[in-house]
Amino acid sequence: MQEKFEQSVKNMLEIIGENPQREGLLKTPTRVFKAFEFLNSGYKQDPKQILNDALFESSNNEMVLVRDIEFYSLCEHHLLPFFGRVHVAYIPDKKVVGLSKIPRLVEVFARRLQIQEQLTEQIAEALMEHVGAKGVGVVIEARHMCVEMRGVQKANSTTSTSALRGSFLKSEKTRKEFFTLINSAKQVRF
């Protein structure tokens, strides 16, 4: 598989008019393979296993929020990066998940070819399904290189998406609390 991938990179370099044999490009096919292997490593990870290994009994029934989780992903349309921050909240139902597992869950889905809308929904659905939360709220704010580097070339534009499930969707009070918390003392730095 690696050999086939590397040959494809060499072919691409030739198509754009480069010489894959010049010094600066000799190791590029291997580097690109390793980069893509890492950036798409989420396909080899099971969200259920990550979350179920860290579920703990709890009487807590108040909102748990992990804010400003940085992520990087590749747009499935152009294979260009998009990156930003994810805010994830849930209301437990007799079980809480280890806090470090929420950023790991984000990484599992971000390290797949993606669109931001789908990434937002996948995080919310995984928490609802595998943690058994009463509700989940996910907001992603991201910059897309397919918008900034090509096409309309609008630097520094930000795309925001949200996915609300359970009590976050049904209760205006819960929704308001979530959006207030993620916007309080907000400092967006990319």
Curated annotation (Swiss-Prot):
Pfam family, one: GTP_cyclohydroI
Catalytic function, reaction form: GTP + H2O = 7,8-dihydroneopterin 3'-triphosphate + formate + H(+)
Family matches, as SUPFAM superfamilies: Tetrahydrobiopterin biosynthesis enzymes-like
Keyword Cell cycle in record: no
Pathway assignment: Cofactor biosynthesis; 7,8-dihydroneopterin triphosphate biosynthesis; 7,8-dihydroneopterin triphosphate from GTP: step 1/1
InterPro entries attached to this UniProt entry: GTP-CH-I_C/QueF, GTP-CH-I_N, GTP_CycHdrlase_I, GTP_CycHdrlase_I_CS, GTP_CycHdrlase_I_dom
The keyword Zinc-finger belongs to this UniProt entry's keyword annotation: no
Annotated Zn(2+) binding sites: 75, 78, 146
Class of this enzyme: hydrolase
GO CC terms, sorted: cytoplasm
Keywords recorded for this protein, A-Z: GTP-binding, Hydrolase, Metal-binding, Nucleotide-binding, One-carbon metabolism, Zinc
GO process terms (BP): one-carbon metabolic process; tetrahydrobiopterin biosynthetic process; tetrahydrofolate biosynthetic process
Subunit structure: Homomer.
Family, as annotated: Belongs to the GTP cyclohydrolase I family.
UniProt-recorded name of the protein: GTP cyclohydrolase 1
Source species: Campylobacter lari (strain RM2100 / D67 / ATCC BAA-1060)
High-level lineage: Bacteria, Pseudomonadati, Campylobacterota, Epsilonproteobacteria, Campylobacterales
Gene: folE
